[in-house]
Amino acid sequence: MTERVLIAGSGVAAVEAVLALRHLAGRGFDIDLLAPSHALEHRPASVAAPFGLGAPPPLDLHELARRYAVGLVDGRLVRVDVEDRQASVVGGRAHHFDHLLVAVGARPVQSIPGALTFRGPADVRAVEWVLAEIARGHRRQIVVTIPPGGTWTLPAYELAIMAASQTSGMPEATVTLVTPEREPLWIFGEAAGQALRELLSERGVELRTEARVAHLTDDVLWLESGEAVKADTVLSLPYLEGPRISGLPCDEEAFIPTDAHGYVMGAPNVLAAGDATTFPVKQGGLATQQADAAAATIANALGAAVDPRPFAPVLRGLLLTGGAPLYLRAELDAQGISRATGHRRLASEASSHALWWPPGKVAGRYLAPYLSTARPVSLGTEPLVDRVPSGSKAHTAEHHAALDLALLLADEDAAAGDLPQALHALDAAAALAGGVLPVAYSERRERWLGELQSRTSATTPGVPT
């Protein structure tokens, strides 16, 4: 009887696991994706949307399922019967599994009452409204905050840097970043901290480190030190809470404990990956690495000639700035990590040149290559690889010139009717810009891709595109 792997979730860890399993173990088993949504949102890139940059469109999971022979099952996992190997969804329906991977993510919750919590695509319009209010002179002071205990702080720096660029020159407009960190993006080490301090200074962002928010009142953000920070607009990152799956163990914050190979403690044949686990750093690239470790473990159990290596986290962060992106990389020690003691950094790099390829926001071994073009590529593409940083520094003017050239080539190719080449040029532009494009070109990419698919359908009837 064919073994069945059930993957619960529709985020980056779940999709990475699908790609990894098919790459490692082929198609001699069934994969079902138990998904509450049939689209993978590019959540990390959504931070750029309020500033006139278009995030890549959501990935259609139906296309992924068709391409890789995956069953797509509606539902949100709420309960696991470990002994009977049954996974139940909202409404009570149960699904059998031989191997279960829980990749359901975490739940973002408001961290500061009265502040605008930026969680992703759903909050883009609210940030756009704030920027419009500042442009009209109705608001002046933006404060971006990071809640205590937050380990993945990079989106706050992106919000502050791009907000400062957008409001530059507006009368009395100020941007302040308040963080409990000792240094900016301290999780990446000294190289990142120094690079961020310089960048924040260049963009005119006031930085307050080792500062914890107490509460927010009318136009004043109060710190635990008693200091008052003027703020008629406060943007905050959320707290994250675990999924609390009935039948599975969890810590006090409802996150699922796992070993280095992804196995859930005390639950044979059940693994977990991504933000749902107790690993303290909640970041897309790390979630894909956990998914890779879990997929290798499952592939080995299915009989594939795979050596299941333990999760060895390498943190890769692409900081969107509105100009040339900043690439950050650090090796983390996966042993003995706790929320109380933090982690030990083993290596730290910061560069204006790509430190991995393809240079996506979510640096997944299989997911990044799959999403690196306008049309998702096959598994024949080489997996993500790290790169040695260039010794030279990319200059903003050179970056903009290269980006403008790529966009011009895309327009010229499209005007000549060569849509495949136009899409290649946009892929190059997106790589230069950290995966995001000006909104107009993001819309053109969707239009050109639709036209190309229509042409293909017309010339090859009966063949799916």
Indicate where each model-derived feature is located.
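Alpha-helical junction/boundary sensor with strong preference for TPR arrays
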Residues: 432-436
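A conserved FAD-binding loop/helix module that cradles the flavin
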Residues: 273-321
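A Rossmann-like FAD-binding core segment of flavoenzymes
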Residues: 30-32, 71-87, 95, 167-260, ...
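Beta1-alpha1 glycine-rich phosphate/pyrophosphate-binding loop at the start
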Residues: 2-70, 149-187
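FAD-site-proximal beta/loop scaffold in flavoenzymes
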Residues: 111-138, 228-290
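C-terminal auxiliary extensions adjacent to catalytic cores
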Residues: 327-393
